[in-house]
C-alpha cells in the first residue's frame, strides 16, 4: 500500500467497510493455529492487522502452513525461501493459493494475492485461512494440529437410500400442496340456490 495514495469518497467508504470486517479475535486464533500447524518455527507477530499482514506478506509462512497439512515428502510447495523482492513474495503467495485450491478450498473462498500483499482485504485472507482450517479438521487424516473447535464444523454428506417399494408407496401419497382428502368436505351440502331441507 506504500505506492497507493489515500482513498477518497466512495472508495474510502468501501475500504472502511472492508476494514470493519477484520476480526482481531480471529487473528489470534489463526496465529495460534499457524504456529502450531507449521513444522518449522515461523515466529509470532505482534497483535494488529498490519503486523499480521507483514507476517504473512512474503508467503513463506503460508507455504509452511499448507506443507504442514500434507504428509512428509508430499508437500505441494517444494521451494520456500524468504525474499524481499515483491515478485518473489507474490509468487509464493500464489503458490499457496494454488496449493489451497488443490487441497479442496473453493475458488470463490480464496483471496486474491493483492488482498494480502497490499493489505486491501485482510478479512478475506482470514476467511480463506478459516476455510482451510475447517477443511483440514473435516478431512480427519491425522495431519491437523491444534484445537478442532477453533474452526466451524463442516457438514458431512448424509445420503438416503430408498427401496423400490418405498418409492412406489410415495407415489400414492397426496402431497399437501394438492390439498388433503381428509377433514372438512362438501359432502351432504346442497347445491347453490336450492332450499334448505329442515326436518
Curated annotation (Swiss-Prot):
There is a cross-link at residue 171 (Glycyl lysine isopeptide (Lys-Gly) (interchain with G-Cter in SUMO2)). SMART domains: CH. Calponin-like repeats lie at residues 174-199. The modification Phosphoserine is found at residues 11, 163. GO terms for cellular component: actin cytoskeleton. The modification N-acetylalanine is found at residue 2. Gene3D superfamilies: Calponin-like domain. The modification Omega-N-methylarginine is found at residues 182, 196. Keywords: Acetylation, Isopeptide bond, Methylation, Phosphoprotein, Ubl conjugation. Pfam families: Calponin, CH. GO terms for biological process: actin filament organization. InterPro entries: Calponin-like, Calponin_repeat, CH_dom, CH_dom_sf, SM22_calponin. Transmembrane segments: none annotated. It comes from the Eukaryota. The modification N6-acetyllysine is found at residues 17, 20. Residues 24-136 form the Calponin-homology (CH) domain. The modification Phosphothreonine is found at residue 180. GO terms for molecular function: actin filament binding. SUPFAM superfamilies: Calponin-homology domain, CH-domain (SSF47576). Belongs to the calponin family. This is Transgelin-2. It comes from Bos taurus (Bovine).
Amino acid at each position: 500500500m506504500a505506492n497507493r495514495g489515500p482513498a477518497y469518497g466512495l472508495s474510502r467508504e468501501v475500504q472502511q467497510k472492508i476494514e470493519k470486517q477484520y476480526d482481531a479475535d480471529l487473528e489470534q486464533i489463526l496465529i495460534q493455529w499457524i504456529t502450531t500447524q507449521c513444522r518449522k518455527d515461523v515466529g509470532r507477530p505482534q497483535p494488529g492487522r498490519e503486523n499480521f499482514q507483514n507476517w504473512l506478506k512474503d508467503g513463506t509462512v503460508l507455504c509452511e502452513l499448507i506443507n504442514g497439512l500434507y504428509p512428509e515428502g508430499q508437500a505441494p510447495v517444494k521451494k520456500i525461501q524468504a525474499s524481499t523482492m515483491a515478485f518473489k513474495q507474490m509468487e509464493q503467495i500464489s503458490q499457496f493459493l494454488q496449493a489451497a485450491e488443490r487441497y479442496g478450498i473453493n475458488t470463490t473462498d480464496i483471496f486474491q494475492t493483492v488482498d494480502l500483499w497490499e493489505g486491501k482485504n485482510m478479512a478475506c485472507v482470514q476467511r480463506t485461512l478459516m476455510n482451510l482450517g475447517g477443511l483440514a479438521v473435516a478431512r480427519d487424516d491425522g495431519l491437523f494440529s491444534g484445537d478442532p473447535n477453533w474452526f466451524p464444523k463442516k457438514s458431512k454428506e448424509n445420503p438416503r437410500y430408498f427401496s423400490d417399494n418405498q418409492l412406489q408407496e410415495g407415489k400414492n401419497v397426496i402431497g399437501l400442496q394438492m390439498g388433503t382428502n381428509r377433514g372438512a368436505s362438501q359432502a351432504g351440502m346442497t347445491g347453490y340456490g336450492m332450499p334448505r331441507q329442515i326436518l
